[in-house]
UniProtKB/Swiss-Prot annotation:
Keyword Hydrolase carried by entry: yes
Protein name according to UniProt: ATP-dependent Clp protease proteolytic subunit
Keyword list, A-Z: Cytoplasm, Hydrolase, Protease, Serine protease
Superkingdom of origin: Bacteria
Main subcellular localisation: cytoplasm
UniProt gene name: clpP
One Gene Ontology CC term in the entry: cytoplasm
Amino acid sequence: MSYLVPIVIEQTSRGERSYDIWSRLLKDRTIFIGGPIDDHVANLVIAQMLFLEAEDPEKDIHLYINSPGGVITAGMAIYDTMQYIKPDVSTICIGQAASMGAFLLAAGAKGKRFSLPYARIMIHQPLGGVQGQATDIDIHAREILRMRDMLNELLTKHTGQPKEKIERDTERDFFMSAAEAKEYGIIDEVITVRK
């Protein structure tokens, strides 16, 4: 299904200029993840982050997240880029940040991780499925367990929660309100009004 992308017109002293809404928001250093995270989404988000870093390495980037999660490797590509680039990446949850979306929300710069009040946040262990020979299934099972351990370690680092608690809580879907996510350490502040 294709969607109409709104066009905004900006008036300047030199005349009018029209932008699609995403390009206009990018001028304000705002990036959106507005759906499942796959390689295509990751490549777009990473390209925008690298562009904004080249434009001004000292100015924050604002990453808005409304995502049910997605592919671990795609999410980790975004995560690694967030940690690699010079500008702080402020994360803001709107709607929901689940699974890899919640992980990226927690990975924002300390003190700059936010959620709107009625958003929901959910963490859980990696999901996966494989079929084939027993050896192949074993290889993939060990890889999923390795990724689970890596994600739990990183959530421990970003939230300040003990690893044992993260392991317990991610055993099944663990839903939180914005206020609960703040208490958990996934975000720093619940925001109701833009400052």
